[in-house]
UniProtKB/Swiss-Prot annotation:
Domain of life: Bacteria
Record protein name field: Chaperone protein DnaK
Any single GO BP term: protein refolding
Entry-linked CDD domains: ASKHA_NBD_HSP70_DnaK-like
Stimuli inducing this protein: By stress conditions e.g. heat shock.
Purpose: Acts as a chaperone.
UniProt region (Disordered), positions on chain: 599-632
One Pfam family from the record: HSP70
Polar residues: compositionally biased ranges: 604-614
Compositional bias (Acidic residues): 620-632
One MF annotation (Gene Ontology) recorded for this entry: heat shock protein binding
Protein species of origin: Thermodesulfovibrio yellowstonii (strain ATCC 51303 / DSM 11347 / YP87)
Record InterPro entries: ATPase_NBD, Chaperone_DnaK, Heat_shock_70_CS, HSP70_C_sf, HSP70_peptide-bd_sf, Hsp_70_fam
């Protein structure tokens, strides 16, 4: 039986992952990259290019290079979103006979699912090269706020690419699954997902082994693309002021501006200022024109502030729908490349009143979650004989691949217990019941006993149908599981018997594994926190060096730069919490010496000829920064 892969089909980039030996792996593409640009191009020779190679030639071939196709998935041509996209995108968008938005390249019309399928095929091929076997099944993620037509379009893209789409799952749910937060108890979490083209906020409640999505909201037309557009518009307006030329009429110039805007935006996540240099951007009667501008982080934040603020309204709605306040959220998870923007992180932190969790790569986490879900769906059925008491908990897989216990371990038999579940999607007419035994929080980590399906559920909005799942262990230790639709009375059941059950040693091993994983989760969190602390310290000290560098002796500057590099190296390479903390402490001491030197110099200048009010203010600034560093 072949492997099923997990795919994050993104607006800007796409990622493919697979679970190998119980661990999710992000699969590199043919160019060795872990993310693949969601770009498709057609050359004048009739060649089709996908990914990085397509993105590289976009400047010289803008009309035949398709990007951000996800924004057109499942949309009507006359929709406001498509009409807005037409103004911005260099390729031709046309109306299909059914009213959908299609693209036209060299006289040939393509549907968005067709273009998306080309991206999926590249990812499928990368997975086959990696695994050395054909891949025919996948779980593909979509924004939680995607409507039915957008979801169907995504599923169609999979079929076109030769993939049997086992499931379409929501990106925030996949992210929560990959982060492993489902292993914690009694937690309310918010997943803030700002990607290249879409924004989602999901409020999830985790407790007693169940992931329950309490509310979701979002904007399927808000993302990093819009940030790029703001920078592009600023560049165009500034250039127009300088040269009197409107670059909007030049498609090749627009493509260069788009790439430069995206690059500048990314650089400003770590730098305070960046230079945008586009020689020969255009020409007029007087000769060629060059674009050379500086963009500061502060200016970028000013340009995109309303976009970031726009994401807060869905957050408020989702919290309201969930019946929760910001203070009741225990953990905030950032997903999507655009959440690397410091201003986004600050706004989210201010809104929820707590620092967001940054433990996993926001570009890859959704694909990893999809791969885990794919592995869960491909679980092998194994029969087992149960003993007089049930030594391990029995339950089923629920939303997000979580193990929901129905009968706890050490329950005396015979026993019979029931629980009511519901559907996870609108108009769902069937549910698959997967029966597991074990103590781990994720179903895939436990032992799969059997699978059966309840069909014929009348179509209804998700959350409306009531499915009663009953576990019945008789005196012979035989487990019967049934699922009944309470509205129609339709029922399906499975009887699990086996010639050999779990041995005592296997039971002990499962318990040990569960405990070991709990410890491992704690250790990973400690490492993430230590690295965050190191990042903060490095940023603070580097800022002090930039601001006060001319007042520090050369020897002292050299010592502190060495301490910064050492701290950064250890942070990036070490998995030892104590080693990272020691490096942070060493850097803190080095920065403290700088503070003392600055303080002494400030004191000496005060004793000189009458210090001015301005110098006193500077002293105050220095002291405040020293205090802030020490507090950290």
């Amino acid at each position: 039986m072949g492997k099923a892969i997990g795919i994050d089909l993104g607006t800007t980039n796409s990622v493919v992952a697979v679970v190998v030996g119980g661990e999710p792996v992000v699969i590199p593409n043919q160019e060795g990259q872990r993310t693949t640009p969601s770009v498709v191009a057609f050359t004048d020779k009739g060649e089709r290019l996908v990914g990085q190679v397509a993105k590289r030639q976009a400047i010289t071939n803008p009309e035949n290079t398709i990007f951000s196709i996800k924004r057109l998935m499942g949309r009507k041509y006359n929709s406001q979103e498509v009409q807005e996209a037409k103004k911005r995108l260099p390729y031709k968008i046309v109306e299909a006979p059914n009213g959908d938005a299609h693209v036209e390249i060299m006289g040939k019309r393509y549907s968005p699912p067709e273009i998306s399928a080309m991206i999926l095929q590249k990812l499928k091929q990368a997975a086959e090269d990696y695994l050395g076997e054909p891949v025919t099944e996948a779980v593909i993620t979509v924004p939680a706020y995607f409507d039915d037509s957008q979801r169907q379009a995504t599923k169609d893209a999979g079929r076109i690419a030769g993939l049997n789409v086992l499931r379409i799952i929501n990106e925030p749910t996949a992210a929560a699954l990959a982060y492993g937060l489902d292993k914690k108890k009694e937690e309310k979490i918010a997943v803030y997902d700002l990607g290249g083209g879409t924004f989602d906020i999901s409020i999830l409640e985790i407790g007693e082994g169940v992931i329950e999505v309490k509310a979701t909201n979002g904007d399927t037309y808000l993302g990093g693309d819009d940030f790029d557009i703001r920078v592009m518009d600023w560049l165009i307006e500034e250039f127009k002021k300088q040269e009197g030329i409107d670059l909007r009429k030049d498609r090749m110039a627009l493509q260069r501006l788009k790439e430069a805007a995206e690059r500048a935006k990314i650089e400003l996540s770590s730098a305070m200022e960046t230079e945008i240099n586009l020689p020969f951007i255009t020409a007029d009667a007087s000769g060629p024109k060059h674009l050379l501008m500086k963009l500061t982080r502060a200016k970028l934040e000013q340009l995109v502030d309303d976009l970031i603020q726009k994401s807060l309204e869905p957050c408020k709605k989702a919290l309201s729908d969930a019946g929760l306040s910001q203070s009741q959220i225990d953990e905030v998870i950032l997903v999507g490349g655009q959440t690397r923007t410091p201003k986004v992180q600050k706004v989210v932190q201010d809104f929820f009143g707590k620092e967001p969790h940054k433990g996993v790569n926001p570009d890859e986490v959704v694909a990893v979650g999809a791969a885990i879900q794919a592995a869960i769906l491909k679980g092998e059925v194994k029969e087992v004989l149960l003993l007089d008491v049930t030594p391990l908990s029995l339950g089923i897989e629920t939303l997000g691949g979580v193990f929901t216990k129905i009968i706890e371990r050490n329950t005396t038999i015979p026993t019979k217990k029931s629980q009511i579940f519901t559907t996870a999607a609108d108009n769902q007419t069937a549910v698959t019941i997967k029966v597991y035994q074990g103590e781990r929080e994720m179903a895939a980590d436990n032992k799969l006993l059997g699978v059966f399906e309840l069909v014929g559920i009348p179509p209804a909005p998700r959350g409306i149908p009531q499915i009663e799942v009953t576990f019945d262990i008789d005196a012979n230790g035989i487990l019967h599981v049934s699922a009944k639709d309470l509205a129609t009375g339709k029922e399906q059941s499975i009887r699990i018997t086996a010639s050999s059950g779990l041995s005592e040693e296997e039971i002990k091993k499962m318990i040990r594994e569960a405990e070991a994983h709990a410890e491992e989760d704690r250790r990973k969190k400690q490492i993430a926190e230590a690295r965050n602390e190191a990042d903060n310290m490095i940023y603070t000290v580097e800022k002090t060096l930039r601001d006060m560098g001319d007042r520090i002796s050369e020897d002292e500057r050299k010592r502190i730069e060495e301490a910064i590099e050492k701290c950064r190296r250890i942070k990036d390479t070490s998995n030892d919490v104590n080693e990272i903390k020691a490096a942070v402490e060493e850097l803190a001491k080095a920065s403290h010496r700088v503070a003392e030197e600055l303080y002494k110099k400030a004191g000496a200048s005060q004793q000189g000829a009458g210090s001015t009010t301005q110098s006193k203010k500077e002293e105050d600034v220095i002291e405040a920064e020293v205090e802030d560093k020490d507090n950290k």
